[in-house]
């Protein structure tokens, strides 16, 4: 299979008062290859959740075409359910009054997973996500972090080709977020599970996804790798230099756009253009001029990239 996900001119309209039709998703075209980890970014109302609902068969497109694992998600929704996993941050696929372990057992039957394969997958998830202490606890009594770890496990027990996660870290504490990030990164790198995530927590996206698709008003603004987006929209890189002794601003260096002097001249931040000079060239020029105690390069943050995209 060349692609796990194929969207071609995808459009979804909703009827508003007085017959006015609003396009929540407006002509989106993109493809996702097996093993990719793709972050879908956009403000509230951008069309992310509507797109997720169409590719999982919950909503029917107004126009365009969508194929997931080579299947039409509306016409072959039951077959597709055995090949993808879905996690909605605000909606559970677990049985509220049953212990977590019993929910997993029911899902094994629903997806017709062989007992040996189910046991292997479950043991792996229990170990990596540290589920053992609350497997016997009814889902309604779990904390949000515990339940979300259970949701991700439930979505992966049938070995899906594609895992779709809609705001999976919303409301989670730092420890729960980290456990989930590490587990998802492993599922992608080791098991080859294709990931499609929507998140508002941009650092989470940065750590999990090598490709970002930014949408607004139902349209794709940009689609590319994080490095590519940084180069195009992130602005200047920064070289932070800690000096052995105070020094006047290090001006006149090649490619340097701006110099910020801190700590009475002991620290200087040099904003530089990657198109005019490399970090290695700038470091060599700095070291040739002053005695350096430490230095490091700061890349434009993903927040900077997204802010530039939305504000122009």
Feature annotation, model-predicted:
Residues 97, 138-145:
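Conserved ABC ATPase signature
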Residues 163-167:
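Catalytic Walker B motif of ABC-type/P-loop ATPase nucleotide-binding domains
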Residues 105, 109, 116-134:
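Conserved ABC ATPase "signature" region
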Residues 56:
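Helix-to-loop junction immediately C-terminal to a conserved catalytic motif
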Residues 1-4, 13-27, 77:
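A short, flexible loop at the N-terminus of ABC-type nucleotide-binding domains that lies
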Residues 159:
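Conserved catalytic motifs of ABC-family nucleotide-binding domains
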Residues 181-273:
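ABC transporter nucleotide-binding domain
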């Amino acid at each position: 299979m060349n692609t796990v996900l194929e969207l071609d001119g995808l459009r979804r309209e909703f009827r508003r008062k007085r017959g006015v039709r609003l396009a929540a998703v407006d002509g989106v075209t993109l493809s996702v290859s097996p093993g990719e980890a793709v972050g879908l970014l956009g403000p509230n109302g951008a069309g992310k959740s509507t797109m997720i609902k169409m590719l999982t068969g919950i909503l029917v497109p107004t126009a365009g075409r969508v194929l997931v694992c080579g299947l039409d998600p509306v016409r072959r929704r039951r077959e597709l359910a055995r090949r993808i996993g879905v996690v909605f941050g605000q909606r559970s696929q677990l049985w509220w009054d049953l212990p977590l372990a019993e929910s997993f057992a029911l899902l094994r039957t629903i997806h017709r997973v062989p007992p040996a394969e189910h046991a292997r997958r479950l043991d792996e998830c229990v170990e990596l996500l540290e589920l053992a202490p609350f497997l016997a606890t009814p889902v309604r009594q779990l904390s949000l972090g515990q339940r979300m770890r259970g949701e991700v496990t439930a979505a992966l027990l049938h070995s899906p080709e594609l895992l779709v996660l809609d705001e999976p870290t919303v409301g989670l504490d730092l420890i729960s977020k980290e456990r989930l990030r590490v587990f998802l990164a492993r599922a992608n790198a080791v098991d080859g599970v294709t990931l499609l995530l929507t998140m508002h927590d941009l650092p989470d996206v940065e750590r999990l996804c090598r490709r970002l698709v930014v949408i607004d008003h139902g349209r794709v603004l940009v689609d590319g790798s994080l490095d590519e987006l940084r180069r195009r929209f992130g602005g200047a890189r920064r070289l932070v230099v800690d000096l052995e002794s105070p020094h006047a601003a290090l001006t006149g260096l090649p490619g340097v756009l701006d110099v910020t002097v801190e700590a009475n001249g002991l620290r200087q931040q040099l904003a530089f253009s990657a198109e005019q000079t490399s970090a290695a060239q700038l470091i060599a020029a700095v070291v040739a001029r002053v005695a350096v105690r430490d230095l490091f390069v700061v890349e434009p943050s993903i927040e900077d990239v997204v802010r530039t995209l939305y504000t122009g």
